[in-house]
C-alpha cells in the first residue's frame, strides 16, 4: 500500500470515529436532556396525582378549620361559682385554692388538681368541679360537720375521724373529749357507748376524759362528773346507773360529783355542805 493510501485510510477512520462520537452524544442528550424529561412526564398519571393532591388539600383545610374552631371555643375561664353553704371554710381560703382556674383554659384546666387541693383542706369533706359552657366552672363543696371537740383545739366528725387536730375555728356547744395522743378513736367509741347507756337513766353526757394513767371521767350537762377510775370501768358504770335510777335521780341537781371507784357503791359529793355518802 502506498503512503498516500495509508494517509487517506487514516483520515477516513478519524472522520468515522468523530461521527460515531457525535452520534453517541446526541443519543445521550436524548436520554438525559429536556426531551427525556418530557417523555418521562408523559408516563405520569396526572389525573390520579391531582385527585390525591385535592384530597390532601381538602383534609388540610378541614384540620385547620377544626384547630381554629377549638381555639375559638376554648375560652379562658371567666367565672368560678361556689355552691354549698360555708360555715367553717373562709371565702378567702376557697378563693385562693380556686385561683389556678381563673383565666385558665376552659378545656385543659386542671380540675382534678384543684379538686384535690380543696379536699386537702381539713374542713372540706368532699369537693366536685364541673365545667359550665362557655367559660364558667362550678365548684360544689361539702364541709366536715364537727360532732365532738378533741383536746380543746381539734374536732372529730360523726364517723369518729379526727379531721382537724388544731384550728382557729371555734364551735360552741359540742361535747368535749380529752385523752392522750392517738387515743381519739378509743375515747370516741367509749363516749358513744356510754352516752347511749346513760341516756336510758336520763343523763346527758357532754364530755369524756381519759387520763394518761388510764382513768376515765364522764361529765354531764348537769354540771358534775363521774369518776370511774381505770379498773372494772364497765362494772362500775353499771352499778352507778342502777343506783342513780333508784336513788340519785331525785337529787341530781344537788350533786357536785360522784366517785364510783368503790367495790360496792359510790361516793357522792353534794353541792351543799354535806358529808359525802356511800351507797
From Swiss-Prot:
Transmembrane segments: 49-69
Periplasmic face residues: 70-279
POTRA domain residues: 75-144
Compartments in which it is found: Cell inner membrane
Coiled coil: none
Cross-referenced InterPro entries: Cell_div_FtsQ/DivIB_C, FtsQ, FtsQ_C_sf, POTRA, POTRA_FtsQ_type
Region described as Disordered: 1-28
Cytoplasmic side stretches: 1-48
Cysteine pairs bridged by disulfides in the record: none
PROSITE patterns tied to this protein: POTRA
GO BP annotation list: cell septum assembly; FtsZ-dependent cytokinesis
Keywords: Cell cycle, Cell division, Cell inner membrane, Cell membrane, Membrane, Transmembrane, Transmembrane helix
Range of residues in the leader sequence: none
Topology in membrane: Single-pass type II membrane protein
Cellular component GO terms held in the UniProt record: cell division site; plasma membrane
Assembly information from the UniProt record: Part of a complex composed of FtsB, FtsL and FtsQ.
Homology family: Belongs to the FtsQ/DivIB family. FtsQ subfamily.
Function: Essential cell division protein. May link together the upstream cell division proteins, which are predominantly cytoplasmic, with the downstream cell division proteins, which are predominantly periplasmic. May control correct divisome assembly.
Protein name: Cell division protein FtsQ
Source organism: Hahella chejuensis (strain KCTC 2396)
Amino acid at each position: 500500500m502506498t503512503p498516500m493510501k495509508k494517509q487517506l485510510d487514516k483520515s477516513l477512520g478519524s472522520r468515522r470515529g468523530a461521527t460515531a462520537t457525535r452520534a453517541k452524544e446526541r443519543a445521550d442528550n436524548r436520554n438525559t436532556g429536556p426531551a427525556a424529561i418530557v417523555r418521562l412526564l408523559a408516563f405520569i398519571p396526572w389525573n390520579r396525582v391531582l385527585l390525591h393532591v385535592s384530597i390532601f388539600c381538602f383534609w388540610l383545610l378541614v384540620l385547620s378549620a377544626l384547630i381554629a374552631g377549638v381555639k375559638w371555643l376554648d375560652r379562658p375561664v371567666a367565672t368560678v361559682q361556689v355552691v354549698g353553704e360555708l360555715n367553717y371554710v373562709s371565702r378567702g381560703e376557697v378563693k385562693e385554692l380556686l385561683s389556678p382556674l381563673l383565666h385558665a383554659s376552659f378545656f385543659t384546666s386542671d380540675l382534678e388538681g384543684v379538686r384535690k387541693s380543696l379536699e386537702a383542706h381539713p374542713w372540706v369533706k368532699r369537693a366536685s368541679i364541673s365545667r359550665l359552657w362557655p367559660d364558667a366552672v362550678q365548684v360544689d363543696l361539702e364541709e366536715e360537720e364537727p360532732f365532738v371537740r378533741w383536746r380543746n383545739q381539734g374536732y372529730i366528725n360523726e364517723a369518729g375521724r379526727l379531721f382537724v387536730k388544731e384550728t382557729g375555728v371555734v364551735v360552741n356547744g359540742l361535747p368535749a373529749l380529752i385523752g392522750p395522743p392517738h387515743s381519739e378513736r378509743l375515747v370516741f367509741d367509749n363516749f358513744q357507748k356510754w352516752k347511749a347507756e346513760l341516756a336510758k337513766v336520763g343523763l346527758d353526757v357532754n364530755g369524756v376524759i381519759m387520763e394518761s394513767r388510764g382513768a376515765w371521767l364522764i361529765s354531764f350537762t348537769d354540771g358534775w362528773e363521774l369518776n370511774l377510775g381505770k379498773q372494772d370501768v364497765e362494772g362500775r358504770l353499771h352499778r352507778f346507773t342502777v343506783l342513780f335510777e333508784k336513788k340519785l335521780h331525785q337529787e341530781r341537781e344537788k350533786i357536785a360529783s360522784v366517785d364510783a371507784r368503790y367495790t360496792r357503791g359510790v361516793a357522792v359529793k353534794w353541792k351543799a355542805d354535806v358529808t359525802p355518802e356511800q351507797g
